[in-house]
Amino acid sequence: MPGSWPPRTVIRKSSGLRTLESALYRNGLGPVAGVDEVGRGACAGPLVVAACVLGPNRLESLAALDDSKKLGEKERERLFPLIRRYALAYHVVFIPSHEVDRRGVHVANIEGMRRAVAGLSVRPGYVLSDGFRVPGLSVPSLPVIGGDAAAACIAAASVLAKVSRDRLMVEMEEQHPGYGFAEHKGYITPAHTAALTRHGPCVEHRYSYVNVRRAAEATGVRWASDRVGVRWSTESAAETEEVRRALEAFEVEWVTAPVEHEDAACAKMGSG
């Protein structure tokens, strides 16, 4: 029976993206899943977490895998369908802004990672996470500093999360014009700050973020002060449902209830 930790092995980052995963497979700890998030630093839009399991053999089709932040948009879009085609399993979880507000971004991120791993159709023998430990997983795991540039499965998860979130933010621009979501994807940029100053925040902004609250106060936008602790209004729930329907083609799990509960009411749209 595989142990919880592999024997001590020297892994050099320069050895390639598959070196760490290969060492785990050789020691009987596969399949190996990578998990990563996108949107942690954004002040609008969801936090998106993806988990991905790649097979033990290197695929030439995925040779360009790297940290999604280092890849251009065209390259990410090219890799996105290839990862979904060749991965043994993948699962993407969207955590909406009101849930990030309610739980806090770090706790929401950890819970999203747990759900992404739990949603895989193939049970991993080991999980590699990008940067920090994910407590509460049912299988052994290891945080990898700079993981999306050091392990192919994390890099693949990073691309899945990034492309899925970017596509949603383009959809969000159509629902909330004037903010430039299609361009800055909800991150804090001069253009986004200027839009907040002009219009005040919309329901997709994260009111637990200081810049969003200040913009709301400066523009007189009414916002529920208890949003940071509970979910938004029924109007927000309706908008969330509209966005959820737009996500059906992405094969994701849309978290529509507190993420700390495993029996949360989720609209599950496949796991790849």
Curated annotation (Swiss-Prot):
- A cellular component term (GO) from this record? cytoplasm
Q: Which GO terms describe its biological process?
A: DNA replication, removal of RNA primer; mismatch repair
Q: Which cofactor does it need?
A: Mn(2+); Mg(2+)
GO molecular-function annotation terms? manganese ion binding; RNA binding; RNA-DNA hybrid ribonuclease activity
- Which controlled-vocabulary keywords does the entry list? Cytoplasm, Endonuclease, Hydrolase, Manganese, Metal-binding, Nuclease
Q: Which CDD domains match?
A: RNase_HII_bacteria_HII_like (cd07182)
Q: Which residues form the RNase H type-2 domain?
A: 30-221
- Subcellular location, principal: cytoplasm
As to how many cofactors bind and how, the note says: Manganese or magnesium. Binds 1 divalent metal ion per monomer in the absence of substrate. May bind a second metal ion after substrate binding.
Database matches in PROSITE patterns: RNASE_H_2
Q: Where does a divalent metal cation bind?
A: 36-37, 130
Q: Which reaction does it catalyse?
A: Endonucleolytic cleavage to 5'-phosphomonoester
The Enzyme Commission number assigned here is 3.1.26.4
Localization recorded for this chain is: Cytoplasm
Record InterPro entries: RNase_HII, RNase_HII/HIII, RNase_HII/HIII_dom, RNaseH-like_sf, RNaseH_sf
EC class of the enzyme, as a word: hydrolase
Cross-referenced Pfam families, in alphabetical order? RNase_HII
Entry similarity comment: Belongs to the RNase HII family.
The job of this chain, per UniProt, is described as: Endonuclease that specifically degrades the RNA of RNA-DNA hybrids.
Q: Please identify the protein, giving its name as recorded.
A: Ribonuclease HII
Q: Which organism is it from?
A: Mycolicibacterium smegmatis (strain ATCC 700084 / mc(2)155) (Mycobacterium smegmatis)
What would be the name of the gene that encodes this protein?
rnhB
